[in-house]
Amino acid sequence: MKRSNFIKYGLTVLTASAALLGAGGTARAADRKPNIVFIMGDDIGMWNIGAYSRGMMAGTTPNLDRMAKEGMLFTDYYAEASCTAGRANFITGELPIRTGMTTVGQAGAAIGLPAEACTIATALKAQGYATGQFGKNHLGDKNEFLPTVHGFDEFFGYLYHLDAMEDPFHPNYPQNLLNVVGPRNLIHSWATDTDDPTEMPRWGKIGKQKIEDDGPLPPHPMAGIKYNMETIDDTIIADSLAFMDQAKAANKPFFVWINPTRMHVVTHLSPKYAAMMNSQNGWSIEEAGMAEVDDEVGSVMQHLKDMGVDDNTIVVFTTDNGTESFTWPDGGTTPFAQCKGTVMEGGFRVPCILRWPGHVPADSVQNGIFSGLDWFPTFLNAAGNPNITDQLLKGVTLGDRTYKNHLDGYDQMAAITGNGPSARHEIFYLGESTIGAVRIDDYKYRFIDQPQGWLGVKNHPDVPTITNLRLDPFERLGFPEDMTKQGSLMFMGDWYMYQFWRFVFVQQMMGKEIQTFLAYPPMQRGASFNLDALKAEMAAKMAQAEAAAKGAGQ
């Protein structure tokens, strides 16, 4: 299917979705509903954006800096520790331990976005929105997990971490296993009203979507292959802009989730951006890659202006997880402790910039606690349905499915418009399926130590660490290994002794959260690279088999 044929296949679905304006929706004109553009970079370092680092870094990001000047910059914005979890966090508004999307998704894995999970796209489609997703997905590669059966009208992109797409091009990759364990190719898909029963090997039933295979994604241009990592972002951005144009032509407000490849490893720059690294500016590959990210943001902002809709469009720029610094200089920079994959601030606290003229105060800084979870109810409020949280708690039909879910996000409309404080007081830091830390207002209680970072051992000390993130945002203080009071660490020992009483708040918070899991159980067991859970399950099944065998022999 040619890209221009979206009008033939996609607008049929868009027109049909106009009938789904129930569940608190209204039939307001499209120009009264804000368009929503959510740009989610990959592994972006907070300090690699000029608006945050204030010139401390060599690179420049003029478009992102302008966006911050015209909108709001967040200092206490939280994603998740890894990409799958961070993307599920945003699109479902639920903690990843509810959806089971807790760690990096692998090719052919049985775990993906559950059918029971309601997405922002599904809820916005019920409000009359055209919904498109372009670029990285990483929420499962089987057909049942694709975006176009989870509320999106159109999807183009890839389904894993970027380097997974590069695996088959390594000289030692066993090509005879490519169709057994290899990554799925780039996908272009469209939602349809027809349920296609066709079963695809490895990927399952097609369902209510049309799917095209757009080929592999090699690191560099290759004869006979359509796309490559050097320039794939050009197509991701172009398709995103084309979708906006088509939605406007159909008089539809649009929600577009843009997911460029940068700055995930391995960074393969086009000649244009590779040439930006020179002896005059001292740039590394990270600065050159961030220049590409910034140009992409500039292209989106200029296109919205050319369309005449920039003043009625919510634009958010953020990233999926804490920056990945262990492959530096092909890695980002953060002022916070540790990086991606840990429960330290560097694993969760990420950049976020919001622009919405006439609603979000220009050149403002938001110091309240925010989470990627919060966009679901906030966007729905902006779209005309402020009741989505209560509706999902009770059960609501959206499209052809009834959902009953516990949103963990808060409606932050008052905070982003300057009319009140953040509605959020807590952050749960998930180390895959384990709660590794909790933040309650200014205080963080950490139960896991990861001194070697994501790739190292997780220690579970008997005594957790308490940090006041307003006094020590970079988590510089802690106990010395020999538990003696030495130097600056003396403050931590005395201070900790007089703050220990605060753990009662953690107990209360955890008790309250556990109750929600009793009423709204997890949809599936979360994935993990730790085999302990799998070994325990295998042992339990072996015990069941032995018991059954004994019973049969009696």
Task: Describe each model-derived feature in a short phrase.
Residues K2-P464, L469, P473-E475, P480-Q554:
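Formylglycine-dependent sulfatase
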